[in-house]
């Protein structure tokens, strides 16, 4: 039952809907129901119970998916009452709920052993102690957590012991979000991947040089080989590139790495050491890393190959699709050009406020068109060389916004070449093979289209006002407008997308009869 579209549904009606599904319900999404009361939650718990109304202990439901993010009025006791009756729960999202406490983690550990996905982001009453308790319980029972996805954005008081227990208890983690954990330190990252010599699962022994330590040390360092595919450490402001060194060789399956917002503490040494061990990397976020140099881009730039089909798939950068290096002011244009030419799958490049040149942007646009990359995007805002002349030069291959055809996008008034909406300016914003170019000059095109539409609409109104009652109507004289979604009009054969221009009608929405 997906009820997120009805956040103001009365409690009586909500209970009636849930009661109709009863114990057969396996999914419940109450995201955004800010007025949901604790008494209502307790009533819903009874409705979902397999044995509700019967004197059988303990009652339980069959929920495998539960999303209560944003339910700010729910109390801790009512939430725990529901969780104690959800033994089959696999996906649990309570993002931003003040009712979530450290005790909630204990309840999850005892009553929800099948959890695969857990989102406890931005829960102000939760601290690292609760996560340590959650992980330590699994270690004590010698039963590793089944968790594949864990999101803890904004968690407070994360210690080395917390990360060590989590690393030991959750060997199957593929997605880990620790963004905005502002007291997360390098040593906690080290504790997460460190393991003893008798570690039962996959591990690797590293030399001091490989581990980013003093090469003169005589010892070796053992690291767990994790299954992580997505790691987010964005805005963990206490981290440095030393944390990257700790993670090197420990994440061979990683595809998405987010290190944005850390700033100048990210240096070349640790970042390069990590990137050289990530052959499957598809997205890299290094926003605000203003101290990195060309060495970082070179570490993810495959060597030129005359035969793209036989390109080595073990080379970092061969799978790179999305790169964010905004405000990395020390990166040279030559490094950008080499990256653009040698990363065959590069589809999104965000390089605002960098030294990227107009030539590099033109090369990206040309190669994206040749490779037929859908929805390719280049962001070059506040780049000195990207002036209005350059934008006009490549206007035939670009668009200012990533438009799409849907009723939800109607108010955004995307310019669609499939509509009979010739305004004389702008580019087709719904053509997936046009490259999205975001610059100050390209955004002016959006304003120009809006101004042209407004001017044309005013002209139509004046002509309509001057038309005599016996003459032809304005609608007959004007070209056919978009009929994709007009009140009371049957949808046409389907090629026209929504438009903000409503001829002879200033109001959007339903027509009152």
Question: Predicted segment positions?
Answer:
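Inter-repeat linker/turn residues at the boundaries of leucine-rich repeats
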Residues: 23, 34, 58-61, 69-72, ...
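C-terminal capping region of solenoid repeat domains
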Residues: 161, 179, 186-260, 265-513
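The feature captures the LRR N-terminal capping module
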Residues: 3-16, 21, 31, 43-54, ...
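N-terminal adaptor-interaction module of cullin-RING ubiquitin ligase components
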Residues: 1-42, 80, 106, 132, ...
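Conserved hydrophobic beta-strand positions in leucine-rich repeat
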Residues: 1-4, 26-31, 64-69, 89-95, ...
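Ankyrin-repeat helical core positions
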Residues: 18-19, 45, 49, 83-84, ...
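Leucine-rich repeat
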Residues: 9, 36, 42, 72-75, ...
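Glycine/serine-rich loop-strand microenvironments at binding/catalytic pocket rims
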Residues: 15-30, 105-118, 166-176, 274-284, ...
């Amino acid at each position: 039952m997906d009820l997120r579209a009805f956040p103001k549904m009365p409690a009586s009606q909500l209970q009636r809907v849930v009661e109709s599904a009863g114990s057969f319900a396996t999914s419940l999404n109450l995201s955004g129901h800010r007025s949901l009361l604790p008494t209502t939650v307790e009533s819903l718990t009874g409705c979902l119970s397999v044995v509700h109304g019967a004197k059988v202990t303990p009652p339980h439901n069959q929920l495998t998916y539960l999303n209560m993010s944003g339910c700010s009025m729910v109390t801790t006791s009512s939430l725990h009452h529901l969780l104690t009756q959800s033994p089959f729960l696999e996906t649990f999202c309570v993002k931003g709920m003040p009712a979530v406490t450290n005790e909630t983690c204990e309840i999850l550990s005892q009553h929800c052993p099948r959890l695969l996905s857990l989102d406890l982001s931005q829960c102000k009453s939760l601290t690292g102690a609760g996560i340590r308790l959650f992980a330590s319980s699994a270690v004590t029972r010698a039963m590793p957590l089944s968790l594949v996805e864990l999101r803890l954005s904004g968690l407070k008081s994360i210690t080395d012991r917390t990360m060590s227990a989590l690393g030991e208890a959750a060997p199957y983690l593929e997605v880990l979000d620790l963004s905005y954990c502002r007291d997360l330190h390098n040593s906690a990252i080290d504790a997460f991947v460190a393991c003893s010599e008798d570690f039962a699962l996959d591990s690797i022994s590293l030399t001091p040089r490989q581990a980013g330590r003093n090469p003169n040390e005589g010892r070796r360092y053992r690291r767990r080989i994790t299954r992580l595919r997505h790691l987010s450490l964005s805005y963990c402001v206490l981290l440095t590139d030393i944390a990257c060194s700790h993670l090197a060789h420990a994440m061979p399956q990683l595809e998405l790495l987010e290190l944005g917002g850390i700033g100048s503490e990210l240096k070349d040494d640790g970042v390069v050491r990590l990137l050289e061990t990530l052959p499957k990397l598809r997205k890299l976020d290094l926003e605000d890393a203003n101290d990195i140099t060309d060495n970082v881009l070179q570490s993810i730039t495959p060597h030129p190959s005359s035969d793209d089909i036989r390109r080595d798939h073990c080379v970092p950068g061969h799978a790179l699709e999305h790169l964010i290096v905004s405000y990395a002011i020390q990166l040279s244009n030559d490094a950008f050009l080499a990256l653009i030419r040698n990363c065959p799958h590069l589809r999104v490049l965000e390089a605002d406020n960098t030294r990227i040149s107009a030539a590099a942007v033109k090369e990206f646009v040309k190669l994206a068109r040749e490779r037929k990359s859908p929805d390719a995007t280049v962001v070059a805002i506040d780049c000195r060389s990207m002036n209005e002349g350059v934008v006009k030069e490549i206007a035939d291959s670009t668009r200012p916004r990533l438009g799409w055809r849907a009723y939800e996008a109607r108010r955004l008034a995307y310019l669609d070449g499939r509509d009979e909406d010739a305004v004389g300016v702008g580019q087709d914003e719904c053509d997936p093979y046009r490259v999205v170019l975001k610059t100050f000059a390209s955004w002016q095109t959006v304003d120009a289209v809006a101004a042209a539409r407004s001017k044309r609409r005013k002209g139509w109104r004046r002509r309509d006002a001057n038309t005599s009652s016996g003459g032809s109507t304005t609608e007959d004289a004007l070209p056919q407008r978009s009929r994709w979604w007009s009140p009371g009009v049957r949808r046409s054969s389907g090629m026209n997308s929504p438009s903000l221009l409503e001829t002879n009608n200033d109001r959007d929405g339903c027509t009152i009869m």
